[in-house]
Amino acid sequence: MCKNDATTNEKKPNQLTHRVMVGNVPLGGDAPVVVQSMLNAPANDVDANLAQIRELAAAGCEVVRMAIPRRDCLDAFQRVCEQSPLPVVADVHFDAQIAVEAARRGAAKLRINPGNIGGLAKTDAVLDAAGEVGIPIRIGVNAGSLDQDLAARRDLTLPQKLAASAAGYVEYCEGRGFHDLVVSAKAHDVMTTVRTYRQLSRDLPHIPLHIGITEAGTQFQGVVKSASGLGILLEEGIGDTMRISLTDDPVVEMRACWALLSALDLRRRGPEIISCPTCGRCQVNLIELAKQVESNLMSTTKPIKVAVMGCVVNGPGEARDADIGVACGAGVGVVFKHGEVQRKVEEHAIVDVLMEEIGKL
């Protein structure tokens, strides 16, 4: 993605990041922001992981990450890679040999933290293994694994320390001839994360960045925190791939990712529901009506705008840019397309008629 001047809200593309391939998915350069998630099924359960991958793929996931906590999980990882419809990233901590084996067993990318993988000699083995099979590596750093000398420096802020740590590892890898790198430096605090990625974008303008707010929390708080931080970064042109990390079903992460990208007009997938917050003029159960429409459209991938309005004040006038919508009155709804009234229906039939008309688009 284009890196922009982080000091202004104006879009000012400076330089494209280096493109890497994660399986058949391009990441970086002029490629669109890649949406990804992480499996949370037991690492040894092949069927459960594959079922989750299929659900994620149907929800718009493009790359999926799988933790390999022990060497006895490698066989399961290989079987998942062989059958997965999505590229699978191996997430490895503490044991470099697992990363080496994962590269040989079908990983589309490796995710390591050089600070806990066992030192530079073991990092070398991982670089060699990835280089042999031609897959990229994501270097993920965090405050807990900073070099002690770097962590102790009082002249640097935490974002500067995280960026310096990542830059040091990038320099080392590139010095050994390995260039297919992606970098992340996530924190659970929104503005620490934003400042860190701004620093990374300045220090490593050629490196694709994986952005996210780590340990963001449960659905409501996690989506708010992630949208706040990632929205800032994406608007500034920072970020080549993203994950919204939630303590929830990973499929919920996909809905949040695509909603954010759509809100920023970066990518679109599936419908956008436009609905008013209701007021004393509303004479139908609009809250339930909007929820029904949203639920019925959950599996729709068509990028359309659907308006569900509580009265004639808000629709079709204020929702004129919607592809289709309904403006409700006393027990009735007026269905409109692009601001033009199509038909009037009873309240009990609004959802069915709206779905019927959407099917014609």
Regions found by a protein language model. Give the residues of each.
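Glycine-enriched alpha-helix->loop->beta-strand junction motifs that scaffold or abut catalytic
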Residues: 83-86, 103-110, 131-134, 201-207, ...
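Hydrophobic faces of well-ordered beta-strands that scaffold small-molecule active sites
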Residues: 33-39, 62-66, 88-92, 110-112, ...
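Glycine-rich, proline-tolerant flexible connector loops at the mouths of alpha/beta enzymes
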Residues: 38-49, 57-84, 111-119, 181-190
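N-terminal amphipathic alpha-helix/helix-capping segment at the start of soluble metabolic enzymes
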Residues: 2-38, 131, 295
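Hydrophobic or amphipathic alpha-helical targeting/insertion segments
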Residues: 97-138
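Catalytic alpha/beta core domains of metabolic enzymes, predominantly
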Residues: 141-142, 150-299
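Alpha-helix-loop-beta-strand connector modules within alpha/beta enzyme cores
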Residues: 70-92, 125-137, 198-207, 293-297
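Active-site mouth loops of central-metabolism enzymes
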Residues: 30-48, 67-69, 86-94, 115, ...
